[in-house]
Swiss-Prot record:
Subcellular location: Cytoplasm
GO biological process, one term: tetrahydrofolate interconversion
Protein name listed in UniProt: Serine hydroxymethyltransferase
Marked site (Plays an important role in substrate specificity) residue numbers: 226
Amino acid sequence: MSFPKELEKVLEITKAQNVWRRTQTLNLIASENVMSPLAESVYMSDFMSRYAEGKPYKRYYQGTKYTDEIETLAMDLMNEITNSKDCDLRPTSGTIANAAVFRVLAEPGDKALIAPVQAGAHVSHTKFGTLGALGIQHIEMPFDEQNINVDVDKAIKMIEEVKPKFVVLGGSLYLFPHPTKELAPHVHAVGAKLVYDAAHVYGLIEGKVWSSPLKEGADIMTVSTHKTFPGPQGGAIFSDGSEVFKQVSRTIFPWFVSNHHLHRLPATAVTAIEMKYFGESYANQITRNSKALAEALAERGFKVIGENLGYTKSHQVAVDVRQFGGGNKIAKLLEDANIIVNKNLLPYDKPENVSDPSGLRIGVQEMTRYGMKESEMEEIAELFKKVIIDKKDVNKVKKEVIDMRKNFLEVKYTFDDMKDLEKYSSKSLKLII
């Protein structure tokens, strides 16, 4: 019997996606990354068919003995590389992690202070997202335009006046660290808790190029496991022994998660091991690449945000493209050339301009994992110039992009040869490999 046409279409689309994004494009979305072949090999397993409500060794289902083992191991590994005491891997995304924390810390009608939207606050921090869905009032802290950050002095005054239930730092357009250690004492002085959303920078934190918010006074840290930390899509929550963590961990199930997508756990554990051995070199190369790309774009006539601050300290670069037609137009134009970025609000944009903002947000973490370094950032900047400034034929630029990618198809910062792992692995892992 031949395949049904519908099945052929599913397989055709999946193959096309794999070929296009894995081999032909420059993937510069700041919230994406790629797992290693080893992590992918354990991602598809029997765990993906199973349920395990509750915590390890305290389940509501039978048949979870290996789930308990892998979840405990994964949490231990994540705590080790994070230098933290507590980890919960059950949130299925960073936004779910935020929701679980916010709900424990406040009731509907309570107030929360967040980093200004201009300083990169994620939508889940706002009335338009998770906070709004929970009925919690969001109040933006004052913005320091010069430093593209929270205005510390004015924020301290606001904390003292508002006395919020909690304060949120961290963001999605996130070029420079928010002032955790400067604000933490003042947050705690009014009886509030400090939440740090490290979704974008978690890989930089465990790679030791970005300060640990837990060591600077944050009570709890939420993360994504698939941005600068190159694991499977999911979320996690960390603390250094805070009571808040215990409360959140008790309520993740049943409030926000029933089954927590168990196939993530082996892949998260593998990625944590990779980052234990390669995370620092990976994070260092990410930040070198982002700065190199920012400088190369500026040299070619682009208005790169944050020039007075060195452009960036994270994996991200932000570019104002208003003079070329705006973020929406330029992001689509770049995609035609197989360069994948996203349009993004810039600090001086109004929220209502979200559909056609001034800027582009660029992330270098995925192409860094494919082995690109500073010289390739120069090449990428030149490709941007050809498309946007020189108005070259996008099909010709696309061919250049595809040719460039031919040299960067293997994931780095992992164990070089999966066959070499057989001498270290159990028989069961050999079967998977």
